[in-house]
Swiss-Prot record:
Main location: cytoplasm
Cofactor list: cob(II)alamin; [4Fe-4S] cluster
Binding sites annotated in the UniProt record for [4Fe-4S] cluster 2: 195, 211, 237, 240
The encoding gene: queG
The protein's name: Epoxyqueuosine reductase
Class of enzymatic activity (EC top level): oxidoreductase
Domain 4Fe-4S ferredoxin-type as annotated: residue spans: 177-205
Length: 351
């Protein structure tokens, strides 16, 4: 007769969940000093859960919590189809935004997992968390044995590298815990060395304010030092994953809903500037990269056009510089125009 843990492991495999692990719902108190230090240093993004105690104490999310079930689903990092060539230059979304928004996919998986467990074990108390939940997902996953926290701050496993999305069920079930893995980064510092903004601190933490992924998600004017560094990426950044040796040769295609549509993940840049809010939502709204709305994306498109040396964009950029009511778009257009025409700006830049 299979144990409850074995039954849940089989259920997870049947649900196409690539990694599952179990850890006690004990506090993550060892993170407290580091999280406080990061906030005081100005290294946080502002997207983190606000209540520090809730980030560290699972029982504040579920009073009778005993076991946390951590899951990872692997996603593709190489597209099987390329976008067709057109008259327009294309940009790109990072791989974490390919296909359907991973928050939706993970929530469905956790719901299916919880419903399956109920059929096995009867009613139980649980709360599901994905990305924006209270707990630190990578810390939960590492303690549950899914992998280790790399120097890039991401969860890394031998089977799937860091190309995994994480979520967890905090439950009142009593299940034997798994042990952390016995491998790690060793002396490798490739992610730290290749980060173009030196955002990685080298110990698994980062200065989120310097991370290009964060910068592409901000609203308003992007500081000038990051504009050329994003190249033609209009959302996110994958550099610290692409250079990781654990990711070499890995490309997972388990979930059809996460396969990229090349016209969305590598969109034509210039036409994107003419999309209304509704048109943007209709076209890109199912992607994780759309969560901040069209404005940051359109700003990034302007930077990308400048970086791509796309002089065909100059009429549109001049129109934005002269007529757009959004100050950050005017600023971006003037920057791109100067880059393309090598002229002085019309007015001082905001920094």
């Amino acid at each position: 007769m299979k144990s409850l843990k074995e039954e849940i492991q089989k259920l997870a495999a049947d649900l196409n969940i690539q990694k599952i692990g179990f850890t006690k719902a004990d506090d993550f108190e060892y993170l407290r000093a580091s999280l406080i230090e990061q906030k005081e240093a100005g290294h946080t993004s502002g997207f983190e859960h606000k209540n520090l105690d809730e980030r560290l104490q699972p029982k504040l999310s579920l009073e009778d919590a005993k076991t946390i079930i951590s899951i990872g689903i692997a996603y593709p990092n190489k597209a099987e189809e390329k976008p067709e060539k057109t008259e327009y230059r294309r940009g790109s979304f990072s791989r974490g935004s390919w296909g359907e928004d991973y928050h939706h996919v993970l929530r469905r998986k956790l719901k299916e997992l919880a419903e399956g467990i109920e059929k096995i074990a009867g009613d139980f108390n649980y709360t599901a968390m994905v990305d924006t939940g209270a707990l630190v997902d990578v810390a939960v996953a590492a303690r549950a044995g899914l992998g280790f926290v790399g120097k890039n701050g991401l969860l890394v496993s031998k089977e799937y590298g860091s190309w995994m999305f994480l979520g967890e069920l905090v439950t009142n079930l009593d299940i034997e815990e798994d042990q952390p893995v016995d491998y790690g980064c060793g002396s490798c510092t490739r992610c730290v060395d290749f980060c173009p903004t030196k955002a990685l601190l080298g110990d698994g933490r980062l200065n989120a304010q310097r991370c290009l992924s964060y910068q592409t998600q901000t609203r308003g004017v992007m500081p000038e030092e990051y504009r050329e560094k994003i190249k033609t990426v209009i959302y996110g950044c994958d550099i610290c994953q692409v250079v990781c040796p654990y990711n070499k040769g890995i490309n997972s295609h388990f979930h059809p809903e996460m396969e990229p549509d090349p016209d969305l993940t590598n969109p034509e840049l210039l036409p994107l500037l003419d999309l209304s809010n509704k048109e943007f939502a209709n076209k890109f709204g199912n992607m994780a990269g759309s969560w901040r709305g069209k404005n940051p994306i359109q700003r990034n498109v302007v930077y990308a056009l400048g970086n791509a040396n796309d002089r065909s964009a100059l009429p549109k950029l001049h129109d934005i510089a002269e007529n757009d009511v959004r100050d950050y778009m005017v600023d971006a257009a003037e920057w791109a125009i100067e880059k393309l025409e090598n002229k002085h700006r019309m007015r001082p830049r905001k920094r």
